[in-house]
């Protein structure tokens, strides 16, 4: 999320009295861009994420021809200038997702469970 959604989320949390936890996913932007590219070019990704106009049943065999693929410059601009790295509401848990194998999942689950039990 970014600051654009913060007030809406905060108001919903207050209205429905729920506890907010922000998971901020950080990482090497070069690695994250390559991961994003791979995901976008995967035929299993729904085409509507990649094109400016989509109608049910549309097919695009060569995903690299999609007109809304996120370029390197757009990706970097979004990551650096939309406030994703500073968004925080409630308790913050920051996770480096550069290498999934290095994430201590049990520790994350414990931290979240401990918060819920408070």
What are the functions of these language-model segments?
Residues 42-106:
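Small-molecule kinase domains that catalyze NTP-dependent phosphoryl transfer to phosphate-bearing small molecules
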Residues 14-39:
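Conserved phosphate-donor/acceptor-positioning beta-strand/loop module used by diverse small-molecule
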Residues 1, 26-32, 99-101:
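Conserved nucleotide-binding/hydrolysis micro-motifs of P-loop NTPases
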Residues 1-11:
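Conserved nucleotide-sensing/catalytic segment adjacent to the nucleotide-binding pocket
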Residues 12-13, 115:
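Hydrophobic helix-cap positions at the C-terminus of alpha-helices
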Residues 5-6, 34, 105:
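Short glycine-/acidic-enriched loop or helix-start segments at secondary-structure transitions
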């Amino acid at each position: 999320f970014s600051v654009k959604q913060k007030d809406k989320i905060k108001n919903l949390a207050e209205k429905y009295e729920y506890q907010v936890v922000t998971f901020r996913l950080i990482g090497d932007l070069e690695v994250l861009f390559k991961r994003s590219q791979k995901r976008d070019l995967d035929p299993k990704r729904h085409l509507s994420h990649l094109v400016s106009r989509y109608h049910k049943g549309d097919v695009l065999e060569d995903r690299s021809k999609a007109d809304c693929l996120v370029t390197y410059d757009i990706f970097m601009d979004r990551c650096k200038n939309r406030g994703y790295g500073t968004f925080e509401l409630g308790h913050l848990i920051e996770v480096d997702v550069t290498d999934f194998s290095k994430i201590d999942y049990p520790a994350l689950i414990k931290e979240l469970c401990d918060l819920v039990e408070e």
